């Protein structure tokens, strides 16, 4: 790991911990997804927060051409940025928006499994499924996503995470189900579908489980995986109340106070 990676990782970790903004990082330093991933891994190591799972990002293939992406990315989810269903989180000026996702609770036994995770064996590691809202934002002074590496290096843009009730659900039924993220304050509905998540949230889950095992990112407890947004990113204002519904899975809500 070179010195520039360490310096940028340190700065991004400090910005997240102290909830402060960094000046815009030069695109040339983070445009390579592999370098951006190294920056993220170092920032995660320096943050010293408590991981509770992982998030997959860039799972909507229709965005890959714009982002020049060849595959998704992943980063940690943290206890310190997790909120209770129907709870409140403080507004932050760096917020981009809210997303509605499908989340899985996974047995940590998956790390002892010596074979590749596939559709035929993944179900043995799934404890349950839940709807989830992820709030995303920057730790830098900028207004829009200009490259994939900026998303990857900045903790995958994760700011907050909340899940609804965990439930059992047939994996065969999750391929294409309707979702709706609602801004109750603005009285606007934003429909979506799980099929935009790599064609199926299970595909995203399988990809992520194989990636974290390959990178030796082992957790000693059962953990969460969010698979990517089933809706557009919905802008956030202070006072907004968001509720999300995934057909057959239930609902989840979060107030931005």
What does each of the following model-derived ranges do?
Residues 2-200, 206, 233, 238-241, ...:
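Catalytic-core "active-site belt" of small-molecule-metabolizing enzymes
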Residues 201-233:
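A conserved acidic, glycine/proline-rich C-terminal tail/linker
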């Amino acid at each position: 790991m070179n010195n520039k990676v360490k310096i940028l990782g340190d700065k991004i970790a400090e910005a997240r911990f102290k909830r402060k903004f960094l000046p815009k990082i030069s695109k040339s330093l983070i445009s390579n997804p592999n370098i951006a991933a190294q920056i993220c891994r170092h920032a995660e190591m320096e943050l010293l927060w408590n991981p509770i799972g992982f998030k997959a990002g860039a799972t909507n293939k229709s965005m890959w051409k714009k982002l020049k992406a060849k595959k998704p990315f992943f980063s940690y989810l943290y206890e310190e940025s997790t909120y209770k269903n129907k709870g409140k989180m403080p507004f932050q000026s760096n917020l981009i928006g809210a997303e509605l996702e499908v989340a899985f609770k996974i047995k940590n036994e998956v790390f002892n499994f010596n074979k590749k995770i596939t559709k035929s064996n993944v179900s043995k590691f799934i404890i349950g499924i839940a709807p989830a809202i992820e709030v995303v934002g920057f730790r830098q002074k900028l207004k829009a996503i200009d490259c994939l590496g900026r998303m990857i290096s900045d903790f995958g843009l994760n700011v907050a995470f909340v899940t609804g009730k965990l439930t059992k659900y047939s994996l065969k039924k999750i391929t294409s189900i309707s979702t709706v993220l609602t801004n109750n304050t603005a009285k606007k509905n934003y429909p979506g579908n799980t099929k935009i998540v790599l064609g199926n949230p299970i595909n995203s889950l399988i990809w992520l489980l194989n990636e974290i095992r390959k990178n030796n990112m082992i957790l000693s407890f059962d953990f969460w995986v969010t698979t990517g947004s089933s809706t557009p990113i919905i802008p956030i204002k202070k006072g907004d109340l968001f509720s999300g519904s995934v057909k057959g899975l239930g609902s989840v809500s979060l107030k931005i106070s």
